[in-house]
Structures are given as C-alpha cells and as structure tokens.
Swiss-Prot record:
Major location category of this protein: cytoplasm
Post-translational events: Acetylation at Lys-150 is predominantly observed in the nuclear fraction, and may regulate nucleocytoplasmic transport.
Subunit: Interacts with DAZ and DAZL.
Name of this protein: DAZ-associated protein 1
UniProt keyword Nucleus present: yes
Any one Gene Ontology cellular component term annotated for this protein: nucleus
Pfam families from the UniProt entry: RRM_1
Cellular compartments annotated: Cytoplasm; Nucleus
Keyword set, alphabetical order: Acetylation, Cytoplasm, Developmental protein, Differentiation, Methylation, Nucleus, Repeat, RNA-binding, Spermatogenesis
Sequence ranges assigned to domain RRM in this UniProt record: 10-97, 113-190
Length: 406
C-alpha cells in the first residue's frame, strides 16, 4: 500500500458542520471515541469561513467503526454526518451517473432486463408489442414514449423481461420485423432516473414560456400619458375630456408631445391713445367685474384657471377686455392721426359705469363735474362744487381735472 492509501486509514470525513464549529470543538467531540491525531476544517480561501465539512484522523483505525456505530451525531446544535475515508486505489469503479434509460452496447457492470425498441410503426400499440416479444420470454412491462404536446407515439419504447436470458435472445436479433416494418432492438442501459424515461410528460425541467399579451409589445394598457388630458394647475382630467383649450392627445405610438404654452390674450386699446387701466389693487381675491360695450356682463372668472391668464371670451370671436366700437356708429378711421378728443362719447365704452374693483369710477368729463374739490368747469353742465374735497384748501384758482389735459 502506498503512502497516500496509508494516510487515509483511520480518517473520517465529517460533513454538515455548523458555521460556528471550530477545530477545537470538533477535536473535543471525537476525542470521546479515541485519540485524535489530526483534525482540520476546510475553509474558503477568500473569506476564511468554514465550508461546512472537515476531516478527523484517529490513531487507532478501529475507532472509525466505533464512531459509525454510534450514530446519530450532533455537534453545535446540528446533525453531522461522519463517513470513512477510503483510499483512492481501493475505491470501486463506478459508472458515470446518467439520467433515464439509454440505448447502447451491453455493459457487464450494468446489466438489466430492459431493452430499447426503436422504429415502432405508428399503428402498433402496447398490446401488439407485448404479443410479439412474449416469444422471447415473460414480458413484465411495456412502455411506449409519447409526445407531450401532440399526445401521440414518438416511435420508440422499452420492453422489460422477467429474466436476463430473455433479453439476450431478443438482442441477438438486432432487427425485428414487426407489422411489416424493420424495428431495431438494443439493450437499455440504466440511468439514475429509472422510474421516468426521457420524453414522458413531466420529464422536461424547463417550464412552458408565457406568450406576451400583445403582439406589438404593449401589454395590458397603454402608457399613462395616453389616458388623461391636460388640466390647469395639475388637475386630473379623465380621458377624452377637453379643458383649458387642450383636447385629448393624438393617437399613435409613443408619448404625446408636450402641450404648447398658454396663448396670451390681446387687450385692444380704444382710439385716442388712452389705454385701459391695468392691474388690480392689493387685497382683492378676484379681478373686478368689467362691463365694456353692450350685452350682458361676462361670466365670473374660472377659479381653476392658472394665475395670470384672463378668462375665455364671453362671445365667439371677441377677446376679453377688448373695446369694441359701438354698433350704432361706423368704425373709426385708423389712418387719421390721433386727436385730443375721441371720435365718440366715453359712455359708449363703459367708462361711466362703476368699477367697484378699483375703488372709484371713471366719469365722463362732459357729463359729470370733477370730484377733486375745485370749481366746476364752465360749460360742464354740473352743479357747483361742494365745500369739501381732496384738494388742499378752497383754492378757486385751481382748474378742474381733465384726463386729456397736460
């Protein structure tokens, strides 16, 4: 016996060790069965952690039998599995582990009573195979392999006899004539999966693949950007409902383009160069209710509209806060240079009405006297000024206010 074989005598392989088990605890446990001359736990070279197994060598080889007879063994709360280490030269030759049954030449180390039958006619069943092969001996089992998807024979199978002599007689005739077709017969070599032959249902280790729910790659429902419109200030709007001038996004692949910026509303200026008042006094939560021109007043502003954006026009084709010309007169000639006086009275533009949002109204100087405490302007047609006003004292030399006087 060589030195390698002598080194294996009296050695035990110990598997199932706990990660916390050390060489000292392993030696201490097996010392109760005899003198331990060597003890090692195999560790990972990178992490230096236990790999869960090790080796124990006794001085007396007979201690190995004592350990094996004292099963089960528990160390650090786990059941360990000690096995004797057999020298490599003394290990019996084993065939390579395989799966299922395989046709092939006869092997003395793996004899069986099963034969492989290939090329079986499509109209031949298990009954016909049993009737044919029973002339070689007692048939104990007939297995035909079927397609798992189509559920029809694949053209080969296995026959099991009661004794090995029947197998030898069937294999001596390499080709057999069954129902007018030449069939090949070989000895079947056993594999690990003896209870299940290849091709039977359930033999595949891969599950069926799930087909996608949509051929174009979209599964379930379209992207969320296709399902809602654009609302002001982040409001959610159901699909298909237009709000704020934006309709539902266009159909097609990909996400819809971003919405355009809000369109600015143009406020026209009346002839004469006098612009309309702009801005609102502080402390007001809503813009004043203007009533320019003819017709009913515009609807109240949308409280959900974005800040700084005027409400939509009350009538189609007219912009908010615009100053349309009176319907009774023709539109002014814009080719003429501006003059100091307007072409028509102020009242037709709505300046004589109450602008409650500003705290005071704009009056027509040709119809109402100024309210600044000065004397009335000759020809104005108004009553004399009162004794109190906004001026500094009762100075009769102060002329009345006129919006176009500089």
């Amino acid at each position: 016996m060589n030195s390698a074989g002598a080194d294996e005598i009296g050695k035990l392989f110990v598997g199932g060790l706990d990660w916390s088990t050390t060489q000292e605890t392993l030696r201490s446990y097996f010392s109760q069965y005899g003198e331990v001359v060597d003890c090692v736990i195999m560790k990972d070279k990178t992490t230096n952690q236990s790999r869960g197994f090790g080796f124990v060598k006794f001085k007396d080889p007979n201690c190995v039998g004592t350990v094996l007879a004292s099963r089960p063994h528990t160390l650090d709360g786990r059941n360990i599995d000690p096995k004797p280490c057999t020298p490599r030269g003394m290990q019996p030759e084993r065939t390579r582990p395989k799966e299922g049954w395989q046709k092939g030449p006869r092997s003395d180390s793996s004899k069986s009573n099963k034969i492989f039958v290939g090329g079986i006619p499509h109209n031949c069943g298990e009954t016909e195979l049993r009737e044919y092969f029973k002339k070689f001996g007692v048939v104990t089992e007939v297995v035909m392999i079927y397609d798992a998807e189509k559920q029809r024979p694949r053209g080969f199978g296995f026959i099991t006899f009661e004794d090995e002599q029947s197998v030898d007689q069937a294999v001596n005739m390499h080709f057999h004539d069954i129902m007018g077709k030449k069939v090949e017969v070989k000895r079947a070599e056993p594999r690990d999966s003896k209870n299940q032959a290849p091709g039977q249902p359930g033999a595949s280790q891969w599950g069926s693949r799930v087909a996608p729910s949509a051929a174009n790659g979209w599964a379930g429902q379209p992207p969320p950007t296709w399902q809602q419109g654009y609302g002001p200030q982040g409001m959610w709007v159901p699909a298909g409902q237009a709000i704020g001038g934006y309709g539902p996004p266009p159909a097609g692949r990909g996400a819809p383009p971003p919405p355009p910026p809000f369109t600015s509303y143009i406020v026209s200026t009346p002839p004469g160069g006098f612009p309309p008042p702009q801005g609102f006094p502080q402390g007001y939560g809503a813009p004043p209710q203007f009533s320019f021109g003819y017709g009913p007043p515009p609807p109240p502003p949308d409280q959900f509209a974005p800040p700084g954006v005027p409400p939509p026009p009350a009538t189609p084709g007219a912009a908010p806060l615009a100053f349309p010309p009176p319907p009774s007169q023709a539109a002014p000639d814009m080719s003429k240079p501006p003059t100091a006086q307007p072409d028509f009275p102020y009242g037709q533009y709505g300046y004589g009405q109450d602008l409650s949002g500003f705290g005071q109204g704009f009056s027509d100087p040709s119809q109402q006297p100024p309210s600044y405490g000065g004397p009335s302007v000759p020809g104005s047609g108004g009553p004399p000024a009162g004794g109190s006003g906004f001026g500094r004292g009762q100075n009769h030399n102060v002329q009345g206010f006129h919006p176009y006087r500089r």
